[in-house]
Amino acid sequence: MDFNLNDEQELFVAGIRELMASENWEAYFAECDRDSVYPERFVKALADMGIDSLLIPEEHGGLEAGFVTVAAVWMELGRLGAPTYVLYQLPGGFNTFLREGTQEQIDKIMAFRGTGKQMWNSAITEPGAGSDVGSLKTTYTRKNGKVYLNGSKCFITSSAYTPYIVVMARDGASPDKPVYTEWFVDMSKAGIKVNKLEKLGLRMDSCCEITFDDVELDEKDMFGREGNGFNRVKEEFDHERFLVALTNYGTAMCTFEDAARYANQRVQFGEAIGRFQLIQEKFAHMAIKLNSMKNMLLEAAWKADNGTITSGDAAMCKYFCANAAFEVVDTAMQVLGGVGIAGNHRITRFWRDLRVDRVSGGSDEMQILTLGRAVLKQYR
């Protein structure tokens, strides 16, 4: 595997550096985090660069640049302080519809290309069904030529502002043998109620409870095939977990560099604290974690581009990077001392964000279970 960037990838990364240097984005991010607002202006700037077309096939007007390119872009964005967690649907959200959607559904989602606006997200988790997805109780019921959706979802990302969601529900006519199907739902429909939740971190992307009370749908609103809901979302889970891991790495790298600059400038006892062995030890351990994360992610990206990535690979990336990145940020905060906990330093935001990622997108525990099964399966 050669992870040297090619000319096209170098151009993308250079473009990211130029964009991030074009204005004081950190002030904008801090404002969006404080107000729990999606940074649409920033995402629009990325869309103008073609970032939302990186994985779209060329036949649909995309760049089909591959996951190594996505990894390079996400790593650089994160290193420079961008909240890449708001971009999870940007590289792959269009492709999901190109694979699974009807032409009408595809047209509705592709209309958001280049806008930077949030377009859709999945609604799977429920109050009684988190990691235990098989306990879903939201139902769809056919009656008089229509389909009616009833139930509730919780912790649904982006759902305060997305115009569409894809809802996983079980067939109300098959209580003994669950049939799970997804439905493409316009959020403006009658019977939908959204309650925005407050979060510890990841505040630039909304998280909501959604209730469905006899929401009327048509058969044409089915997303994918009936009964194929679980199979479809498995691929989405892997994609999301890889992107979460990329975000974790980039954020950790940003805090590492902030802390390194501080350690070389902060003087105590007559010299820079970076000359103290205890501080050097912290940076050695942070560097080991960062290097391990980077190599793991680039290998996974290469596997994705070559069709060999597995759910185990995605789980490994998600688990290791979520934990290692949080440890890096926590250590960097220790280096910064009072500046890191009492001021307005961005590390406080990063610390909150990364703690959430050990739960969201699949908990640490579920990643371990997925990875353990995948590892042992190779030796059966």
Swiss-Prot record:
Needed co-factor(s): FAD
Enzyme class: oxidoreductase
GO molecular function: acyl-CoA dehydrogenase activity; flavin adenine dinucleotide binding
Catalytic activity: 4-(trimethylamino)butanoyl-CoA + oxidized [electron-transfer flavoprotein] + H(+) = crotonobetainyl-CoA + reduced [electron-transfer flavoprotein]
Keyword Cytoplasm: yes
Biological process according to GO: carnitine metabolic process
Transmembrane portions of the chain: none
Pathway(s) this gene product operates in, as recorded in its UniProt entry: Amine and polyamine metabolism; carnitine metabolism
Record key words, sorted: Cytoplasm, FAD, Flavoprotein, Oxidoreductase
SUPFAM superfamilies documented for this protein: Acyl-CoA dehydrogenase C-terminal domain-like, Acyl-CoA dehydrogenase NM domain-like
Pfam families: Acyl-CoA_dh_1, Acyl-CoA_dh_M, Acyl-CoA_dh_N
Subcellular location: Cytoplasm
Single GO cellular component term: cytoplasm
Enzyme Commission no: 1.3.8.13
InterPro entries tied to this protein: Acyl-CoA_DH_CS, Acyl-CoA_Oxase/DH_mid-dom, Acyl-CoA_Oxase/DH_mid-dom_sf, AcylCo_DH-like_C, AcylCo_DH/oxidase_C, AcylCoA_DH/ox_N, AcylCoA_DH/ox_N_sf, AcylCoA_DH/oxidase_NM_dom_sf
Function: Catalyzes the reduction of crotonobetainyl-CoA to gamma-butyrobetainyl-CoA.
Subunit architecture: Homotetramer.
NCBIfam families in the record: PRK03354.1
Stored PANTHER family: ACYL-COA DEHYDROGENASE, ISOVALERYL-COA DEHYDROGENASE, MITOCHONDRIAL-RELATED
Family, similarity comment: Belongs to the acyl-CoA dehydrogenase family.
The protein's name: Crotonobetainyl-CoA reductase
Organism field: Salmonella typhi
